[in-house]
A protein has these predicted regions:
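N-terminal acidic leader/helix
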Residues: 3-37
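A structural signal for well-ordered alpha-helices, especially hydrophobic packing surfaces
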Residues: 23, 27, 34, 50-57, ...
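Amphipathic alpha-helical binding modules
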Residues: 65-89
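Amphipathic alpha-helix face/heptad-repeat signature
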Residues: 12-15, 19, 42-45, 72, ...
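Short acidic DE-rich linear segments
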Residues: 1-10, 82-89
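Acidic, low-complexity, intrinsically disordered interaction modules
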Residues: 37-73
Length: 89
């Protein structure tokens, strides 16, 4: 049985790459915080964003671009924006 080919989307790949860089930047800023309690609070709050990014990336790698891709990207972006609005980093 032949394997189904993933549908790719260059613009979507650029958004994933940009999202990855944003996650890495925020994590680096969080790890630079000296106060352990504040750092733990930020990490705890940012974990949801990281989880949603990982879900987005894995879904694209496994299934390619699909109807679900836009929803996953939207969920990630909303969580990232919410984190930025609630935490000054």
């Amino acid at each position: 049985m032949s394997k189904k080919r993933r549908k790719l989307n260059k613009d979507f790949e650029k958004k994933i790459y940009s999202s990855k860089k944003n996650v890495e930047l925020v994590l680096a800023k969080i790890y630079d915080i000296d106060d352990e309690d504040i750092q733990k609070e930020y990490i705890s709050a940012f974990n949801r964003v990281v989880y949603l990014f990982d879900e987005l990336k894995e879904n694209y790698e496994l299934h390619g671009f699909s109807d679900n891709s836009k929803e996953l990207l939207n969920n990630y972006e909303n969580a990232f924006n919410l984190f930025e609005s609630e935490f000054e980093i």
